[in-house]
């Protein structure tokens, strides 16, 4: 416990020093995270509209292509990092839980493939890739819900973006390749 307390004290003392090295847009991003209502038409607009859209989805959502915040252009760039906002508005709490369940199954299967793999590289890759997918999902959903600052983290498989989609598909291809390689060793 004394290590945690001493680490916390060092962090508190060092924070003002590190803040002096931040660029103005980085400082604005941090300030917007703590108080988005301070600039509701500027830096805080995206996160405020995101929270409104997620909340307006309610329990069962508004229906496919019937989201008001998203399709009346209150939510800019909804197809990129804020795709979860659009999904939550259209499919509600039930759809969001369903999406989390699908992602959980995907991560479980990736970790499972790593656990049965006999190749050390495949094992490490699957564990690392499963963790990476989990972190991207957690950061994106936390960002959309206002629990973390907006950092531009895509939601795997759903967000619009060529490089993110390509990297995700290559990673899933390596995972599937390790599964096929495992089957060939057994057979």
Map each language-model feature to its residues.
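Structural signal for the C-terminal ends of transmembrane alpha-helices
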Residues: 1, 105-115, 175-182
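Hydrophobic, glycine- and aromatic-enriched re-entrant/interface helices and adjoining loop segments
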Residues: 3-96, 120-122
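Transmembrane helix-bundle signature of multi-pass membrane transporters/permeases
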Residues: 9, 86-89, 129-133, 161-164
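Hydrophobic/aromatic residues in alpha-helical transmembrane segments
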Residues: 26, 103-110, 130, 143, ...
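Hydrophobic alpha-helical transmembrane segments
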Residues: 90-108
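Loop-to-helix entry and N-terminal half of a specific, functionally important transmembrane alpha helix
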Residues: 112-152, 158
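A juxtamembrane structural motif centered on a specific transmembrane helix
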Residues: 140-187
